[in-house]
Amino acid sequence: MNYFFSLVLVFLVLSVVVLGVVSAPYQGVVALMGVSFFCCIFMVFLGRTFAALVMYIVYLGGLVVVFGYCVSVEKESGIYSVGGTKYFIVCVSLLLVVLLCLLREVGGLLVYVNWGDLVCLEMNGVGVFYFSGGWGLIVCSWGLLVVLFSILVILSWSRLGGLRPF
């Protein structure tokens, strides 16, 4: 179980590294989907299954809207590839860190003894989101709306509106 948990965390870090390296928006979409997926898997390991499902649906909904619009108005047709010495050094450094952690058997960082404390966190389910978690969902949806309008302003949506050529 701890090995699978550490594998999920390694994939989470790798997807964040890929997100920092890519230069095309549609490649960033795939990297962000990976980050959100592995974060939700991490939440499932901690016993927050319903929260992980709701956050994954909310996050992917906002992600599809924002980056769907970004990709539709993208004017460049060139495909960028990830290469060069900078990316090679980053990948080799990350590989060395992972190997050092594995050789030292992770050093007990991923070992949590009291799993009994985290077992019954999902008893309330939807009731928690409507009562005390509702404000969190409102803040998340407000953040997605702010990101959507900032992307629209960055892409200068007021110049052409719906009359832009595809």
Curated annotation (Swiss-Prot):
GO cellular component: mitochondrial membrane
Classification via InterPro entries: ComplexI_Subunit6
Record flagged with keyword Cell inner membrane: no
Source organism superkingdom: Eukaryota
Main localization, broad class: mitochondrion
Keyword Electron transport set for record: yes
Keywords: Electron transport, Membrane, Mitochondrion, NAD, Respiratory chain, Translocase, Transmembrane, Transmembrane helix, Transport, Ubiquinone
UniProt-annotated location(s): Mitochondrion membrane
GO molecular function, one term: NADH dehydrogenase (ubiquinone) activity
EC numbers, comma separated: 7.1.1.2
Residues that span the membrane, as ranges: 4-24, 27-47, 50-70, 82-102, 109-129, 135-155
Reaction it catalyzes: a ubiquinone + NADH + 5 H(+)(in) = a ubiquinol + NAD(+) + 4 H(+)(out)
Topology in membrane: Multi-pass membrane protein
Main function: Core subunit of the mitochondrial membrane respiratory chain NADH dehydrogenase (Complex I) that is believed to belong to the minimal assembly required for catalysis. Complex I functions in the transfer of electrons from NADH to the respiratory chain. The immediate electron acceptor for the enzyme is believed to be ubiquinone.
Family per record: Belongs to the complex I subunit 6 family.
Protein name: NADH-ubiquinone oxidoreductase chain 6
